[in-house]
C-alpha cells in the first residue's frame, strides 16, 4: 500500500521518472551507510526490542504523510512539497537500516535450523498476502478517498504491529564478548570474503535486487503513461505480483532443502524474462500475466537466498552478514535512480527491459559455468 501511494503521489506531483528514482534513493543512502552498523547492533542487543522501536518510527512517518496531505500541502497544488516524501523516505531508510538485520536474524533464534527454509517461506507468504491485497486496495482507496486515507491506514497497521511483536519470545544476543563496532563490521566482511559460498549467494542476490527491483518504483510510468490504467491499475499490477509471490511461497515451503542455489539462479532468470516481456507490452492482460511471473521469480530468489545465507552462516556472524545483505536494498535505490534517469533519457521500457536482460545473462552464466555453486543445498 505504501509503495503504491508514495510512488504514484510523487509522480502525480512532479510527473518525473527521475523523481521516482530519487525518492527511492532517499531511502537507499541511509541503508548503504547504516546497514552495517545495524548488523552489529543486531548482534549486541535484543532483536525484539529493535523491531518494536522500528515499528514506532514507521507509525510516526506514515502519520506525518497523512497529515501533510490532509492539510493540503502534499498535493499537486504545491509542486515543491515533494521534499516531504524524500524526507520521509530518508527516515524510513534509517529505520530499515537499523532494524531489518534484526528482523532477518531473529528467525533462526525462534525456529529450528532444519525448519528454517519452511519458516522463511511461510513468513514470506504472509508478506506476499499483503502484497496481493494491499496494492489493489490502495489503488481503489486513493481513487475513492484520497492519499491521506491510505497513509493513515498504514500508520494504524504499523501501530497494530507493535502490539503483535509483544508476543514474540524474548531472545538474547548470541555474542557475549563485545568488541569495537568498527572491528565487528570488518570481521563481518572478512568472514564473507573467506567463505566463497556465502559470497556467491550474496552476489547473485544483489544482482536480482539491483537489476530487477527498479521496476516497482517506475510502475507509475507504465500504469499512467503506457498502459493508461491509472492508480487503480498500478495497484492491480502489483497485486498480481503478490499473487505470484504467494504461489511461489507455497511451493518453496514444501520443497526439500536441495539445490537451493540452482533455485535462486532459475528464479532470477524467470523474473528477468518476465520483466523483459512486461517492459515492452502494451497489452493489459499480458502485463498482468507477466507480473504474476515476476512475483514467482522474485520470491523464489528472495526466499532461497535468505535461507541459504542463514544456513551457511555461523550464528555469531549472522546479524552482520544479514546487514550486509540489507545493503542490497540500498543498492536497489541506486539501481532505481539509474533506471529513472534511463527512463527519462531513452524510455521506461528500455530501462527496465535492458536491466532485466543483464540479469538473465549473469544468471545463465552461473548456471552453465558454475556447476559447484548450483549444486549447493
Describe each PLM feature range.
Residues 1-30, 190-239:
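Helix-loop boundary and gating motifs at the non-cytosolic
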Residues 7-13, 66-75, 133-153, 225-226, ...:
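Transmembrane alpha-helix termini and helix-breaking/packing motifs in multi-pass membrane transporters
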Residues 11, 64-68, 72, 76, ...:
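MFS-fold secondary transporters
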Residues 33, 44, 48-50, 64, ...:
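C-terminal transmembrane bundle of multi-pass solute transporters/carriers
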Residues 105, 109, 147, 151, ...:
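Helix-loop junctions on the cytosolic side of multi-pass membrane transporters
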Residues 60-88, 233, 332:
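Short, flexible, glycine-rich and Lys/Arg-enriched loop motifs at helix boundaries
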Residues 1-6, 25-42, 46-61, 84-143, ...:
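Substrate-agnostic recognition of the 12-TM MFS/MFS-like secondary transporter fold
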Residues 170-203:
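Juxtamembrane intracellular "pre-TM" segments in multi-pass secondary transporters
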Amino acid at each position: 500500500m505504501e509503495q503504491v501511494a508514495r510512488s504514484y503521489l510523487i509522480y502525480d506531483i512532479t510527473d518525473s521518472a527521475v523523481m521516482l528514482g530519487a525518492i527511492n534513493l532517499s531511502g537507499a543512502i541511509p541503508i548503504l551507510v547504516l546497514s552495517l552498523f545495524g548488523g552489529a547492533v543486531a548482534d549486541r542487543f535484543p532483536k525484539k526490542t529493535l523491531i518494536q522501536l522500528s515499528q514506532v518510527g514507521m507509525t510516526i512517518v506514515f502519520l506525518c504523510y497523512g497529515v501533510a496531505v490532509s492539510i493540503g500541502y502534499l498535493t499537486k497544488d504545491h509542486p515543491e512539497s515533494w521534499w516531504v516524501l524524500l524526507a520521509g523516505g530518508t527516515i524510513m531508510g534509517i529505520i530499515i537500516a537499523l532494524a531489518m538485520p534484526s528482523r532477518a536474524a531473529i528467525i533462526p533464534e525462534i525456529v529450528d535450523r532444519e525448519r528454517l527454509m519452511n519458516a522463511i517461506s511461510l513468513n514470506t507468504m504472509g508478506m506476499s498476502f499483503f502484497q496481493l491485497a494491499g496494492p489493489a486496495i490502495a489503488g481503489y482507496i486513493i481513487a475513492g478517498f484520497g492519499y491521506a486515507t491510505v497513509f493513515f491506514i498504514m500508520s494504524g497497521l504499523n501501530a497494530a504491529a507493535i502490539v503483535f511483536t509483544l508476543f514474540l519470545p524474548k531472545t538474547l544476543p548470541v555474542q557475549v564478548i563485545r568488541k569495537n563496532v568498527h572491528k565487528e563490521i570488518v570481521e563481518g566482511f572478512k568472514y564473507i570474503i573467506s567463505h566463497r559460498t556465502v559470497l556467491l549467494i550474496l552476489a547473485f542476490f544483489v544482482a536480482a535486487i539491483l537489476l530487477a527491483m527498479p521496476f516497482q518504483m517506475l510502475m507509475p510510468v507504465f500504469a499512467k503513461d503506457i498502459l493508461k490504467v491509472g492508480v487503480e491499475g498500478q495497484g492491480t499490477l502489483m497485486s498480481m505480483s503478490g499473487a505470484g509471490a504467494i504461489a511461489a511461497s507455497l511451493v518453496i515451503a514444501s520443497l526439500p532443502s536441495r539445490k537451493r542455489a540452482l533455485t535462486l539462479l532459475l528464479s532470477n532468470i524467470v523474473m528477468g524474462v518476465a520483466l523483459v516481456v512486461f517492459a515492452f507490452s502494451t497489452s493489459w492482460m499480458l502485463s498482468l500475466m507477466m507480473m504474476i511471473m515476476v512475483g514467482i521469480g522474485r520470491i523464489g530468489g528472495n526466499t532461497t537466498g535468505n535461507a541459504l545465507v542463514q544456513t551457511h552462516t555461523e550464528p555469531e556472524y549472522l546479524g552482520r552478514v544479514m546487514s550486509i545483505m540489507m545493503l542490497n536494498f540500498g543498492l536497489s535505490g541506486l539501481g532505481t535512480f539509474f533506471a529513472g534517469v534511463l527512463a527519462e533519457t531513452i524510455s521506461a521500457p528500455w530501462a527496465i527491459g535492458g536491466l532485466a536482460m543483464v540479469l538473465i545473462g549473469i544468471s545463465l552464466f552461473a548456471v552453465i559455468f558454475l556447476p559447484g555453486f548450483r549444486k549447493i543445498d
